[in-house]
Amino acid sequence: MQTLRQLGTKAGGEGVILPVGEIIDWPDIEFRGTVEGFYGTPWSHEARLSQLRFYGQNKMNTYIYGPKDDPYHSSPHWRDPYPADQAAQIRELVKVAKENHVDFVWAIHPGKDIKWTEEDMNNVIKKFEMMYKLGVRSFAVFFDDIFGEGKRGDMQALLLNKINDEFVKVKKDVTPLVMCPTEYNRGWADPKPGTYLDILGDRLDPSIHVMWTGNSVCHDITLEGQQWVNRRIKRPSYVWWNFPVTDYCRSNLCMGRVYGLASEPGAKESMGGFVSNPMDKPEASKVSLFGLADYSWNINGFKSDEAWKEGVRRLFPKAAEAMQVFVNHNSDQGPNGHGYRREESVEIEPVVKRVLEAAREGKIEKKDTALLKKEFARMAAAAPVIRAKANNPRLMKEIGAWVDAFEQLGHAGQHAVAALEENNAREAATRLVQATQALAAMDGISRRHNQEGQLYRSAVKTGSRVMAPAVNELADIVSKKVFPAIAGAPALSPKPLVKGGSMDKAELFCDGDRGSFWHSGAYGQPGDW
């Protein structure tokens, strides 16, 4: 139906014209969609309904319900029935999923406290029976991020086969079982033969899907990595791609394009399914999920940049240009413990580099500064258009603080470049003050957002890979030039005062980057000052 909708053109009145032809169209990957598997505030019921309709519109057919903070999905209440109000919501989700040709997959996460007894393994099946009565016909068992007895691969395989034999096969109308293993990425997997992954491969019924995040927790999906795990689990792995999830970088938005996914011959055969773990911001996640839908339907024909921009146009038809400017500069996670980064500010980055290189040498390249100033002006102008025309109140609730900060970054950048170009020291100083005021406004937005009464609070970072660092460096360069001219004395550079055994990377304390930091793991000692 979605293919017909895409082919149809409006005729007069209520009519639609379809071209004459033969449609040959099918997906490269059987199961395509998302896993709500992030740490943080789970999506709201309304957000999930919106997601399911979005999946149907874009040919995704899988939604795996596995929010880490749902106590009835995980410990301590995975054995217990949902309260009546939550059960009613799940029943509605199943209904809407079916209307949109989406499998609602309910996942259980028992591994934190499961007892490997017949009684407790039966408790998993009993919970599935409860969910079956709510209309659920697709199920998953997660053993990720656990310790202790729950990690045993032999017992996990025993439980999964028991569920498969006594529940899935008996019901007749239940889709193949999905499991997320404890060793769900190559970096955490025991490479020795006969260990965890090999046990699953040897003992699990071949119909059971095994999930996999890649060569590490957050990583591109490569054919070589797929082949490595598939040899061990003896089936095509079911990809759980940790993008655009931000539970490890909450200050940033990942609204960039989908790339870094295998597309060479053999790629589609290496995947039994492909789901994305999105952000806790469901509306903002749709930008990247649109690209995932395109990739998983037609891997060889996937064009990353085109899909990204087409997604923005479809999601925000009245604010597409402004939103594209915004997502251009809000796509990277920033430094993080997983070491997974995304490109950001790609088109303007060469200009930024040339401007900074010249400025460090006391030079100005007028052509480049004009281009950079124009981009900062586009950033400042995009924010009010997004507020007025995005036509998505839920989105603005999710990213409103980032849009506000983005506008201030645009103002700060314009003033910083103008200060660099200014020959009059006092005029340059005025521009510099205006730039720092805009940066201070950004800091205020971030602080207020980080103090809001929510469980998972975060700072707000925008343009953090290229544009914000550029403004900070330009402001520093201008200040070193301007203030000595006004004060009649050399400018002083800040230096760290503490010394001792924990000075490694102490230069981050005064590097001018508001996103970096230094901390000492040692107490101050006599003589450290």
Name the predicted role of every residue range:
Residues 64, 140-142, 275:
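Conserved beta-strand positions in the central sheet of alpha/beta enzyme cores
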Residues 480-529:
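Disordered, acidic Ser/Thr/Pro-rich linker "stalks" and the adjacent N-terminal cap
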Residues 108-110, 143-145, 243:
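Short, histidine-centered active-site or binding-site loop motifs used for metal coordination
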Residues 304-487:
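C-terminal functional modules
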Residues 1-127, 133-137, 169:
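Feature activates predominantly on carbohydrate-active enzymes
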Residues 41-45, 220, 284, 506-508, ...:
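Short, solvent-exposed loop/turn elements at domain surfaces
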Residues 12, 37-38, 75-76, 80-81, ...:
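Catalytic-core regions of glycoside hydrolase
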